[in-house]
């Protein structure tokens, strides 16, 4: 039964209630399943957690009418959000915080139980394991529990597979494999017949799927399916082979074998080691192949491939691996195991994009990042430890999250996935993946200066993705996502520099499929620690909770604006709203309210002063007089009310208020930062000179971070200030239309400078300055990049979604 409440204010201190309907489909007790259960997939049933609310994301169109629709939408939603309803806000806030706490505990229990990867069982791999004869020669099955799993898990329609998603490739492969296993041991003929009937009734769907969804053909399907048919025919299982689809599969198989010659396969680890069971009828040199075996005894973590190898060799390491898997999964076998690196790095990515990673910083570092870095190599990353085959997808994800967290990873690893200007996931692959190129494109955006391989990869992946988007070819060979077209559209329209954290989260919460997302390997499978409704519902709660606080802060900003009579200086509340939005979309956490308001008020006052003195009537002499008056008042601690400059009174009053809220005496530091900015602004009236330093100092000081002399004189700090000021100056002028060869956002000089900033912020050293301090500068620069990148209509639409549209 769904937990339903109506409110926009979802945080504890609220005294007023605004009407926004939110439906959360996880009762509080269900999350506690995760909080108390330990030990992996056998104890944690994530599919009990369903998301009842499904909606189609709105298009991310750039504004086409100067932003008028966006302004009207902002005004309309503000009116809705300001409608008062009676009672219950505090009690509701307590309930929401309890739900958030339960969700956080649930996710933390997942981290506690992370082992070799939580993955669904594959009926196909289980069937191959069930085919293994007793190694001691009894004539019976080596793994009777695997046979029992097959008997127990046939679906009502006679097939085996995922009951919630139908793929002809997947269902037919799994069903035929299970029928072969049962038939080979002459048990349960009733289930065999029922399975065969399903197979024959649905074989025609394979041809249709081969036309409409060929991009989602299972990995190695053309190899393993044809081989399985040969095994079935030896057991006198009659398979209709009259469909043209079989001719296409044979052609695909021949192409794959041509790309990976047998000599190569015997000497170099390739993806074909994942499908050795597809080599029936092929003469294999097992002495050579066993030298390519992984340390755990598997063939690149594939139970089915390893089971086939055991049948051919009686290798004890193969046997040991399969015993481990069968015991772990109570008779079943997944399509790959272990998958612990894959799981860990994708979990971090999902939590970050959903905007909830801050709750798990310690767990992410100790459980995921340190582990992924430990297994990072010069060849990149694989999906599991000690696996001799590396892939571009896991390399991209590991590289990106490790670099963003300050780990030293080399971009040279990407050279192992490039040939003649083309980047590939696995060597000798026959088709390319759109999601792999999507992750490659995302990885290239955290490049440091001089990393030419990432420059090449970025151009390649961007061109590939643009072509796929233009052709509307979104089907992928590795995963079925709820809204990949939406994810791709956002990534192409808003590159990382121009993607504000809360904007990305607002869209991704709608794009993320929760436990409905399905992965594609040799069969379809689920990764419940990567895709689940616990993350989704926690992200919704968290977003709406933060948004409610942001709306209350926006009310205080409006009150400050009106009481200070700032409209008399030629600025509007729309400018105020944008200033607050840029701050809230960048620094969104509830506990950082002081920093957020300091950012917003500082930015708006800079804009107010700059705009006021843009007037031709206000000359350079007046700017000079204004600055001198400000210095006289704050340096001599004079009474501000005695000045004729109302703007100075407003500014100093605001700085005093920020000091009071901070709880530390930062007034002199704030005044000094403003004086420094004014001295750069005064000569030419250029408000963007020194803007990054003033904004960053205001934020950092309001957070309670005071600067020591060692910090201020540190070479990296001086470089950080200089580079950030330069970028914000160029980007600010670019937005205002003051274009020159240095201020165009597409100019390579800005791109190189952004790469330098990324390196300065994300490359750690033992004697470096505070990461929090560096991240503040980076957030400010990104906000300038975003504002220069987006047109007015786009910004208005984002303001609506981030500040006034609750997630449902």
UniProtKB/Swiss-Prot annotation:
InterPro entries: Isoprenoid_synthase_dom_sf, Terpene_synth_N, Terpene_synth_N_sf, Terpene_synthase-like, Terpene_synthase_metal-bd, Terpenoid_cyclase/PrenylTrfase. The keyword Manganese does not apply. Its cofactor is Mg(2+). A motif (DXDD motif) lies at residues 391-394. Substrate binds at residues 256, 477. Induction: Up-regulated by wounding. The keyword Manganese does not apply. GO terms for molecular function: copal-8-ol diphosphate synthase activity; magnesium ion binding; terpene synthase activity. Residues 1-50 form a transit peptide. It is found in: Plastid, Chloroplast. It comes from the Eukaryota. GO terms for cellular component: chloroplast. The Asp-Xaa-Asp-Asp (DXDD) motif is important for the catalytic activity, presumably through binding to Mg(2+). Belongs to the terpene synthase family. This is Copal-8-ol diphosphate hydratase, chloroplastic. The gene is CLS.
